[in-house]
UniProtKB/Swiss-Prot annotation:
Protein name (Swiss-Prot/TrEMBL): CAP-Gly domain-containing linker protein 1
Gene designation per UniProt: CLIP1
Pfam families: CAP_GLY, CLIP1_ZNF
Region (Disordered): 1-51, 133-208, 319-338
Domain (CAP-Gly) ranges: 79-121, 235-277
Annotated organism of origin: Gallus gallus (Chicken)
Annotated SUPFAM superfamilies: Cap-Gly domain
Domain notes: Intramolecular interaction between the zinc finger domain and the CAP-Gly domains may inhibit interaction with tubulin.
Function: Binds to the plus end of microtubules and regulates the dynamics of the microtubule cytoskeleton. Promotes microtubule growth and microtubule bundling. Links cytoplasmic vesicles to microtubules and thereby plays an important role in intracellular vesicle trafficking. Plays a role macropinocytosis and endosome trafficking.
Keyword S-adenosyl-L-methionine: no
Stretches with biased composition (Polar residues): 184-204
UniProt lineage: Eukaryota, Metazoa, Chordata, Craniata, Vertebrata
Statement: the UniProt record of this protein carries the keyword Metal-binding: yes
Length: 1433
């Protein structure tokens, strides 16, 4: 409350004024409006004025009187007032039990202290004290009005000095508060504020009345401040009392077409007509209803709610009475307004509208100043009240301090008495405690000894049993050790026999080596000089095979030595363990004997200790009894004054005894617990002993198992060595067979080419497996490096042997002449074999064509799959869009629910504030205008919300339908794709089976050809024995190399089997990843084994090719002998062409290898993609289930929406039932709404952007999911193919796998790499989009919360008292029905265009009948002439 503007009123002087002067000031103030008032008002108040003139003549200013016969005081004012017509008397009371300080509604009539002034009718004054009966007799008739809220609720105003106004010589009571008020000179500036709120009320009402009267038919008007239209009707109606204005609106926002309840008042289109009270209709451009005025009135009401509650002015009284009358008699509110406005409009005739507005504003400012003065008066009252309370507090504190001192003295005395008694008690208790301790110690020792004795006895028994068990276990272990030694001896004998067998096999090998050497010598003598090149290559291969054989022998010896070492080490370990077990048994026997001796000693000591403690216990008990008797004697000899204390001591002794007994029982329990613990410990020791024995037994069993496993391993290894030796023997025998086949190796070219192709296909499969197992590359590189080193050594040896072979071949040229004769027969066989080769080649080409067709079919299926993936991606994107729409609708529903909650809260607050507003509201008509406008806005908002809710429901239904349709489409598409995939798989499987059948037929033909070839070779062997001996040496060398390679293969296979066993053992303990690693290692080793096999096959093929070359050269020599030298040149050209073909085949083979490596990489990538696709397929299924759940939730939400609608309807009914005038203006709420709408628009724009990003992210996710599903399917196909390849790899090498599958796998690998790259890119994009979505969702939530809490943020600038009122929303009120909270006047169903009968009104009287109204009380129910003038103000 800082500096305020000067009011223009002079402060009253401090000197005492006489009655004559006092009468002039208010009279002048009162006469001014009285002169302006028309004669009609004078006629209404003459009766009351004349009735009081007699009383005024009797009394004079300064005379001592009693108000109502019981309130003494002095008359300070006599005359007319502004707050009510007629003569009034202003009295200064002796005590502060009045209602003001001489001023009412900002007009000062006299001056006195606060709460000492009162205005009353002169008829209520008396010059002497009246009895209660007399006072009651005068007041019974008008008790109801005397105690009305308007009379009792008038509060005090600004404080001032009372002595200044009282006449001299009059005794006066002054309180300390009054003295304080005299000393504050600043309060004199606030003494007189002449502008009144009542005048502002009246001027406002008058201006409104003028506005009403200025309305004409055809004027442009605003109904409720928002609906524009043209006046078509003015006058009274049948559906409600009062003047009504029928308006034809510009937009279809009305309720009818000019007719209500069957009677037509004007003509317009349907929903363009609207009826409203005249005071709610404003002419466009009318100055009295400006927004600025509305704001100031609202600010005035909100600023001082507390002051108005306590001390309303005369204007507030008049407004309250008008509001009360409007509430009590709803249909006649307009009549009240018209009458009051007509009464006050006569005073303001002759002035323009602008002057009236200025006056209204000045009066409003003055009323605010008056209210500030009232607030200051309240503060002064509060300070005086606080002073009085402080004095009372001081008195109370003094009394409290005295009482505290007295009580402290008493407490000191009592403390001394208690301390003396406590000392005696403590001494006695100490003695008792000492004796207790002694007894407890003795009992505890006795119990300990008994427990230790029992424990020792149990321990002895247990140890005896344990000794017996250990002796039995020793005997058992000795028998086991004997058995183990016997088994060791048996294994040694077996090893010796196996060693002798190995020696025999080695001798056989030496003999075979000698035979090979002899064959070499024969070959050297049989070969011709022209075969230098071929013999060199053969010798090189023979030397390489010999080296491999030597290496294999060395490795075999190493393995044998390592096995021997392992066996010896295991034997030593077993012996050591047997020794440790025997030593531990001996120790246990010694420990048992020591324990027995200890037990005997402990038993003797326990018996001695028990006897000693028994004697001590008896002596202690006797001494304790004596002490107790002495204490009893001392108690009996005490003084009579201490009998009470002794009685207390006895009770304490009994308590002590009880405690002692409890402690004894507790000790017994403890002892029992300790016994149980000891027993448990003994049992634990027993368990430990058992565990030790079990562990020893387990160790023995483990040792036995180890021995058995070692023996088994040794036996297995010996069996393997024997098998290897047997295989070597078999291979030696096979070498003899192969020596016979050497001359006919030219016929094997076709078969070898087929084998080469089969090996190439298997190499491709193996390469794919090698690429899948990426970790096996390191081992393969190491092996390749070793192979390269071996090849370098072989090349060095070959260069050395070439020089030697050139010399040896010169002597062999002569033998070739003999062979020319036999070549003619061989050529015939060769021709037949070539024909068969051509047939096989044709079959191979047909098989290749079939594979190409299969590849084309696979490509077509892949294209179909891609198309279906795109369709699935589109469907998933649509599903995600629907999901986003669902989420948006759910958020909107939540916002609507929150708005409804806010409205209900506002309703509750408004209901609570109705009573306060009824007391404190001043300008009821203006406020009702504002509140009606606010209520209309709220109704429109509710209608908008309902429309939005219906739209949201429709959208939710549409979304549900769309989701169901999309889900059905997705399911149908998935089923169709599954069916197509299954059909394609069946087709592929049929093709594979056909290919297999073709391969089997080709293999059977190949076997038949082999059989024929073997028969023919067996026939040719007899003829060419001499030539075969020369080739035997080469074959032996090659077979030795094969043996070495096969041994290596066998060793690697055994290692692989061991690794498999280890993997199976590790499955229980390790995870799947370790198992996979071990399996990968095993596969790597298998790949290495296969590579070595392939290398050996390649070396064999090279040797065969060299043989073929030799045979070709022999053929050429025969042709030279039979034919001319020209034929020899032709044969050489043919040989060159064949060599070129072989080289081309080699190049193609290498290219195929590279392609296989690439495809294997692609296969691995595809497998990874398949895994991801499988995961995404699972996610998609989860999303389908989530969609179903969302649909269920939607149905639940729809049900909730219906319930909410029902609640809204019920809430509207409740709101219509309780409606009152509100204080908050729509300007603040509209500004807030515009701000929030702007913020909402911004948020919606952001949401649209986010939705676009979400849609893109979801489309990417759907693409990834489809790719992952394809990947899973491809993985399944790859697994099936791998299983088939494994099954085929177990078959002989001659079996060829279909090339069509390999080609399909290659294509899949290429597409898989591209898909993997796309998936990685899409995953990165999806992660970024998800982050953005999360951030933007957080922003949206914050903005929504800010939007919901916006009203609270806007009202922070108001005072703490205004915060509660600023949140309140206006209540609906209908002027036609006179009901609150149901609907607004513009939305009243009675004026709606309906064929139904009009509803019954709540007013049951005749509408044409004029109701009685009192101008003084401003209430309905009686006329002004019948009013009791006993009221006070």
């Amino acid at each position: 409350m800082s500096m305020l503007k000067p009011s223009g009123l002079k402060a009253p002087s401090k000197t005492i004024k006489h009655g004559s002067t006092l009468l002039k000031a208010p009279a002048s103030v009162a006469t001014a409006p009285a002169e302006k008032a028309p004669s009609s008002e004078k006629s209404s108040s003459t009766t009351t004025a004349d009735a009081h003139d007699d009383f005024v003549d009797d009394f004079r200013v300064g005379e001592r009187v009693w108000v109502n016969g019981n309130k003494p005081g002095f008359i300070q004012f006599l005359g007319e007032t502004q707050f009510a017509p007629g003569q009034w008397a202003g009295i200064v009371l002796d005590e502060p039990i009045g209602k003001n300080d001489g001023s009412v509604a900002g007009v000062r009539y006299f001056q006195c202290e606060p709460l000492r002034g009162i205005f009353t009718r002169p008829s209520k004054l008396s010059r002497k004290v009246l009895t209660e009966d007399e006072a009651n007799g005068t007041q019974t008739a008008h008790a109801s009005r005397a105690t009305s809220p308007t009379s009792t609720s008038t509060a005090s105003a600004v404080s001032a000095s009372p002595a200044a106004l009282l006449p001299s010589g009059i005794p006066q009571k002054t309180s300390p508060l009054a003295a304080k008020e005299h000393s504050t000179p600043s309060q004199f500036s606030n003494l007189s504020k002449t502008a009144s709120g009542s005048v502002s009320n009246l001027s406002e009402a008058g201006s409104l009345k003028k506005g009403e009267r200025e309305l004409k038919i055809g004027d442009r008007v605003l109904v409720g401040g928002t609906k524009a239209g043209v006046v078509r009707f003015l006058g009274e109606t049948d559906f409600a009392k009062g003047e009504w204005c029928g308006v034809e609106l510009d937009e279809p926002l009305g309720k009818n077409d000019g007719a209500v309840a069957g009677t037509r008042y004007f003509q317009c289109q349907p929903r363009y007509g609207l009826f409203a009270p005249v005071h709610k209709v404003t002419k466009i451009g009318f100055p009295s209803t400006t927004p600025a005025k509305a704001k100031t009135t609202v600010r005035k009401v909100v600023a001082t709610p507390a002051a108005l509650k306590r001390s309303p002015s005369a204007s507030s009284l008049s407004s309250l009475s008008s509001v009360a009358s409007s509430v009590s008699s709803k249909p006649s509110r307009t009549g009240l307004l018209t009458e009051t406005s007509s009464r006050y409009a006569r005073k303001i005739s002759g002035t323009t509208a602008l002057q009236e507005a200025l006056k209204e504003k000045q009066q409003h400012i003055e009323q605010l100043l008056a209210e500030r003065d009232l607030e200051r008066a309240e503060v002064a009252k509060a300070t005086s009240h606080v002073g009085e309370i402080e004095q009372e507090l001081a008195l109370v504190r003094d009394g409290h301090d005295r009482h505290v001192l007295e009580m402290e003295a008493k407490m000191d005395q009592l403390r001394a008495m208690v301390e003396a008694a406590d000392r005696e008690k403590v001494e006695l208790l100490n003695q008792l405690e000492e004796e207790k301790r002694k007894v407890e110690d003795l009992q505890f020792r006795v119990e300990e000894e008994s427990i230790t004795k029992g424990d020792l006895e149990t321990q002895t028994k247990l140890e005896h049993a344990r000794i017996k068990e250990l002796e039995q276990s020793l005997l058992f272990e000795k028998t086991k050790a004997d058995k183990l030694q016997r088994e060791l001896e048996d294994t040694r004998v077996a090893t010796v026999s196996e060693k002798s067998r190995i020696m025999e096999l080695e001798r056989d090998l030496a003999l075979r080596v000698k035979e090979v050497a002899e064959l070499r010598g024969r070959l050297e003598s049989s070969k011709h000089i022209d075969d230098v090149d071929t013999s060199l290559s053969l010798l090189q291969e023979i030397s390489s095979l010999q080296e491999k054989m030597a290496a294999a022998g060395k490795e075999h010896q190493r393995e044998m030595s390592s096995l021997k070492e392992k066996f010896e080490s295991s034997e030593e370990a077993l012996r050591k363990e047997i020794k440790t077990l025997s030593a531990s048994n001996e120790r246990m026997g010694k420990e048992n004997e020591s324990l027995k001796t200890k037990l005997d000693h402990a038993n003797k000591e326990n018996s001695d200790v028990i006897e000693l403690w028994k004697s001590k216990l008896e002596s202690a008990i006797a001494s304790h009894q004596q002490a107790m008797e002495e204490l009893k004697v001392s108690f009996n000899k005490g003084v009579g004054a201490q009998t009470a204390e002794f009685a207390e001591l006895k009770t304490q002794m009994e308590k002590v005894k009880l405690d002692y007994e409890n402690e004894m029982s507790n000790l017994k329990l403890k002892q029992e617990n300790e016994k149980s613990q000891h027993l448990k410990e003994i049992e634990a020791l027993k368990a430990k002993l058992l565990e030790v024995t079990e562990e020893k037994e387990q160790t023995l069993e483990n040792l036995k198992a180890k021995l058995e496993s070692v023996e088994d391993q040794h036996l297995v290894e010996m069996e393997d060595t024997l098998n290897k030796l047997q295989e070597a023997e078999i291979k030696v025998k096979e070498l003899d067979v192969l020596q016979a086949k050497c001359n006919e190796q030219t016929k094997l070219i076709g078969s070898l080419t087929q084998q080469i192709r089969a090996s190439e296909e298997k190499l491709l499969d193996l390469a794919a497996l090698q690429k899948a197992n990426s970790e096996g590359k390191l081992e393969i590189q190491k092996l390749s490096e070793q192979l390269q080193a071996a090849e370098k050594q072989i090349q060095n040896l070959e260069t050395e042997k070439v020089s030697n072979l050139t010399k040896e071949l010169q002597g062999k040229e002569q033998k070739l002449l003999d062979l020319e004769k036999n070549l003619s027969a061989v050529n015939q066989v060769k021709d037949s074999l070539e024909k068969e080769l051509q047939l096989l080649k044709e079959k191979f080409t047909s098989a290749v064509d079939g594979a190409e067709n299969a590849q084309r079919a696979m490509q077509e299926t892949i294209n179909k799959l891609n198309q279906k993936e795109e369709q699935f991606a589109l469907m998933s994107s649509e599903l995600e869009q629907l999901k986003s729409n669902l989420t948006v609708m759910e958020t909107k529903l939540k916002e609507r629910e929150e708005r409804e909650q806010q409205l209900t809260e506002a309703k509750v607050k408004l209901e609570n504030d109705i009573a306060e507003i009824m007391k404190s509201s001043g300008d009821s008509s203006a406020q009702l205008m504002k509140m009606n406008d606010e209520l209309r806005l709220k109704e429109r908002q509710l209608e908008q919300i309902q429309l939005e809710l219906t739209k949201a429901n429709e959208k939710a239904v549409q979304l549900q339908k769309n989701v169901e349709q999309t889900a059905q489409k997705a399911e149908q598409s998935q089923q169709e794709t599954l069916k197509t995939h299954q059909e394609e798989l069946k087709k592929m499987q049929d093709q594979l089976t056909d290919m297999k059948k073709q391969m089997e037929t080709s293999q059977n033909q190949y076997k038949d050809l082999q059989a024929k070839y073997e028969k023919e070779t067996s026939e040719m062997i007899t003829k060419h024995d001499a030539d075969i001996k020369g080739f035997k040496q080469n074959l032996l060398d090659a077979e030795e190399a094969l043996k070495a390679a096969q041994k290596k293969n066998d060793e690697l296979e055994t290692q692989a089997e061991e690794l498999k066993k280890q993997a199976e053992q590790a499955k229980a303990d390790k995870r799947a990843e370790e198992v996979l690693q071990t399996m990968e290692k095993v596969t790597k080793e298998k790949d290495a084994i296969h590579q070595e096999k392939i290398e050996t096959l390649a070396s064999l093929e090279n040797s065969r090719q060299t043989n073929e070359k030799l045979q070709n050269e022999l053929d050429m020599l025969k042709q030279n002998n039979l034919k001319n030298e020209e034929e020899l040149t032709k044969s050489k050209e043919l040989l060159n062409l064949e060599n070129k073909k072989v080289e081309e085949l080699k190049k193609e083979f290498e290219a195929l290898k590279l392609a296989a490596a690439q495809k294997s990489q692609q296969l691995a990538a595809l497998q990874e993609e398949n895994v991801k696709l499988a995961e995404e397929l699972g996610r998609s299924r989860d999303e389908v289930t989530s969609h179903q759940k969302l649909e269920e939730e939607r149905s639940v939400l729809n049900n909730q929406l219906l319930e909410m609608k029902k609640r809204e309807s019920t809430l509207k009914k409740e709101i219509d039932e309780e409606r009152a005038s509100l204080q908050k203006s729509i300007s603040d709420t509209s500004a807030l709404i515009t701000q929030k709408d702007e913020e909402l628009e911004k948020l919606r724009n952001e949401i649209t952007v986010l939705r676009g990003e979400n849609a893109s992210a979801k489309t990417l996710q759907s693409v990834v999911k489809t790719l992952e599903s394809d990947k899973l399917k491809l993985e399944e196909k790859v697994k099936n193919l791998e299983q088939k390849l494994k099954a085929k790899s177990e078959q002989p090498l001659t079996v060829t796998s279909p090339s069509g599958d390999i080609a399909a796998n290659l294509l899949q690998d290429e597409s898989a790499e591209d898909k993997q790259q796309e998936i990685d890119f899409l995953n990165s994009v999806i992660v970024d989009l998800q982050r953005r979505n999360e951030e933007l969702n957080l922003k949206i939530q914050r903005m929504c919360e800010a939007a919901l809490n916006g009203n609270e943020e806007e009202t922070i600038n108001y005072d703490s008292e205004e915060e509660g009122l600023s949140k309140k929303t206006p209540r609906l009120f209908c002027d036609i029905c006179g009901c609150f909270d149901l609907h607004d006047t513009e939305d009243c169903p009675t004026q709606a265009q309906m064929l139904e009968e009009p509803p019954h009104s709540t007013y049951h009287g005749s509408r044409r009948e004029e109701r009685p109204y009192c101008d003084t009380c401003e209430m309905f129910g009686h006329w002004t002439a019948d009013c009791n003038d006993d009221e006070t103000f």
